[in-house]
Amino acid sequence: IHAEQAAGFDLNAACSGFLFALQTAQAYIQAGIYRTVLVIGVDSMSHMVDWSDRSTCILFGDGAGAVVLRESKEGLFVQAAHSDGAKGDVLTGCSRHRKNWDHPDEAKAAYIQMDGQSVFKFAVRRVPEIVEELLEKARIQKEEISYFFLHQANRRIIEAAAKRTGVDISRFPMNLQEY
């Protein structure tokens, strides 16, 4: 892209990485450091899954997307970033464990492992809370939002979160069935 006056760095945070990168880009723009930022999100997870474990292999794959953010006086960008370290054992693998191919049990521990029920409950509880937080920060009402774009991991999570948020599911676009 011949960007001679540019900086580049890797921000690695799995599913949340693209959102953290957007927040970082917005902060650079808001601080006046850059006027235009290219954010590229890439996940390469297929080598980290146990293909015999249907609870994870259907959820974690490879993909990429990009967006260009520019300085603008129009529009709205509010953000919220949360984590819960107490839930660290709910989704583990790869960086936490080394693969030891000589010992199959140890090699299996290196793959992504997830307590799907806990992830489901957490997401369904937290998404409506975060939607309310963002609406409050933006000083707008749910009715003013055309679409709510959620992480495309699980249709049931999105449907349950929409119901708990009190917003019709038609305003939560989904494309997971295509992948």
Briefly describe each language-model feature range.
Residues 1-36, 163-179:
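Conserved catalytic cysteine-centered active-site region
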Residues 129-146:
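Phosphate/pyrophosphate-binding loops at sites that engage ATP/ADP/AMP, CoA/4′-phosphopantetheine
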